[in-house]
Regions:
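Generic structural motif
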Residues: 28-38, 77-80
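Conserved, short, structured surface segments that act as functional micro-motifs
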Residues: 75-118
Length: 118
């Protein structure tokens, strides 16, 4: 629920989060949750290496805290394609440990990613 605050251990504060953090091990493969086109690959201070995919109808899937990216901007990928691997968490997530940052946007605005995983 994007209307409730989440406690961030590293930051020692509660804040709203537009994403979910999936706890996992560093080096775990990250698979595309849906088919789409790689829109951008960027370095972000909070989410680290981040891949954003256009998935149609104004939606984007955003995957962060990655390393060893296996796709390039403009690539078309199918569901289940390895897009990269879980990397070392950024300083914003150091106490939470290795995780996949996953967010969804519609027309540039965050939407609850849980609704799209069910």
């Amino acid at each position: 629920n994007m209307d409730q605050t989440v406690y961030f251990t590293t930051l020692d504060q509660y804040k709203l989060s537009p994403a979910i953090s999936v706890q996992t091990v560093e080096g775990a493969p990250v698979l595309a949750s849906v088919p789409g086109t790689v829109y951008s690959i960027e370095e972000d201070p909070q989410t680290g290496t981040t891949v954003t995919m256009e998935i149609g109808s104004g939606y984007q899937a955003v995957y962060g805290q990655l390393k060893d990216i296996t796709v390039e901007e403009g690539d078309t990928v199918t569901k289940g394609t390895v897009i990269g691997y879980v990397g070392t968490p950024t300083k914003y997530y150091s106490k939470e440990g290795s995780n996949l940052y996953f967010a969804m946007k519609k027309n540039g605005e965050p939407v609850d990613p849980i609704a799209y995983l069910l």
